Regions:
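Beta-sheet entry/capping signal
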Residues: 10-12, 51-54, 85, 101-104, ...
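Short secondary-structure boundary/capping segments
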Residues: 26-30, 68-72, 103, 119-121, ...
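Conserved catalytic-core segment of nucleotide-activated headgroup transferases in glycan assembly
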Residues: 1-73
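C-terminal amphipathic helix plus adjacent low-complexity
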Residues: 1-7, 142-181
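Flexible loop/turn segments at secondary-structure boundaries
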Residues: 19-23, 60-65, 93-96, 111-113, ...
């Protein structure tokens, strides 16, 4: 993909709609909002070229035709940072799972969905799945930057973490949404 060295891992950063759930899980611990998280993350990964980075817009960015999102910014920096690319809109999460080695999110569902497929994830803020133990949770800004700097060393997660993610998703997506139970 993108003509990248196939020996390098690929991390996908799953951006949030800028007004999407900023405070749904209480006060944010590291970044004040989705914009700050996205901007700081993109600025940080510029110097980490031992891994390739895909930046994926939240699907609702296209639905709501947001006046501002990070697409223009990422397209602008691609020339100077060939290890960073904007995810084409033609790629969906099912396709992305085939080549992504690490998923990164502030507090989104990719932080639990990708571990269900054995793909490690890095999460920053609290979410509905915080505490189930299937993702790497940043403790503070310094720890988050350390996780990003070592993303190229992350490996497939354990069967126990995969099972935790699968069981959680089954309960959350099937049992809790089934009105017949």
């Amino acid at each position: 993909i993108f003509g990248w060295d196939q020996k390098k891992k690929i991390a996908t950063i799953f951006l949030h709609h800028l007004i999407d759930g900023n405070y749904r899980h209480g006060k944010r611990k590291i970044f004040k909002d989705n914009y700050t998280w996205a901007f700081q993350t993109i600025e940080t990964i510029k110097k980490y070229n031992k891994i390739n980075w895909i930046v994926k817009q939240h699907p609702s960015e296209y639905y709501y035709h947001s006046k501002f999102n990070f697409s223009t910014y990422v397209k602008k920096i691609e020339k100077e940072y060939p290890h960073i690319r904007l995810c084409p809109t033609s790629l969906n999460d099912a396709t992305i799972k085939k080549f992504t080695n690490i998923a990164i999110t502030s507090h989104g569902t990719s932080g639990v969905e990708f571990p269900a497929y054995g793909i490690p994830s890095i999460c920053v803020e609290d979410s509905f799945f915080t505490g189930i133990g299937c993702s790497s949770q940043a403790k503070n800004l310094k720890h988050y930057k350390l996780l990003l700097s070592k993303a190229h060393t992350m490996t497939k997660i354990t069967k126990q973490k995969i099972d935790r993610a699968k069981v959680f998703l089954f309960i959350y997506e099937i049992l809790l949404k089934n009105k017949n139970l």
